[in-house]
Regions:
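Low-complexity, acidic interaction segments enriched in glycine
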Residues: 1-2, 45
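Extracellular beta-strand scaffolds
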Residues: 1, 7-8, 18-30, 34-36, ...
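Predominantly polar beta-repeat domains that present long G/T/S/D/N-rich surfaces used to bind, process
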Residues: 39-151
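Conserved hydrophobic/aromatic pocket- or pore-lining residues that grip, position, or stack substrates
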Residues: 13
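A general structural motif
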Residues: 4, 8-10, 42, 66
Length: 151
């Protein structure tokens, strides 16, 4: 599933293959800006992918993504593209939330150098999601501590 555009309203998109089989899990690809028409809570999008949520190699140099991204069994990322430095972009801004089973990264770095993905990354949580998540998006009415570590 390829996704981009301006979101007016409230929607959840899911991509998968059933019955579930890890060899056939499906990914969502955000190939351009995905932005809310309004950031007042009236517009929202949830994207649920069985596998990965991916930014492709030929994405915009400055990219903005609004929404809740959930990679159920995979990663949320810009893939590492070879050769190093061949696909470095300027900036990605996310507004919403990212939920990922595996890695979450928009940048691949070697020392102080970005070698693939986005050089500058900015993330802001959309506090409207607390009381108004996308329709039918998985949620829980209570919180629990999954782990605790004190040093």
């Amino acid at each position: 599933m390829w996704v981009e555009g301006i979101i007016e309203g409230r929607v959840t998109l899911g991509v998968g293959s059933f019955p579930e089989n890890s060899a056939t899990y499906k990914s969502a690809i955000i190939n351009g800006n995905l932005v809310y028409n309004n950031k007042d809570g009236s517009d929202t999008i949830g994207i649920i992918a069985q596998k990965d949520i991916v930014i492709p190699k030929f994405s915009p140099d400055v990219l903005e993504i609004n929404g809740v991204l959930l990679a159920q069994y995979g990663a949320t990322q810009s893939y590492y593209y070879h050769p190093a430095g061949s696909s470095v972009k300027n900036q990605i801004t996310t507004y919403g939330s990212v939920i990922s089973n595996q890695i979450w990264t928009w940048s691949w770095v070697n020392g102080n150098n970005t070698i693939s993905g986005y050089r500058n990354t900015y993330t802001t949580y959309d506090s409207n999601l607390i009381y108004a998540p996308p329709p039918y998006f998985p949620k829980k009415n209570e919180f629990e501590v999954l782990s605790w570590d004190e040093e």
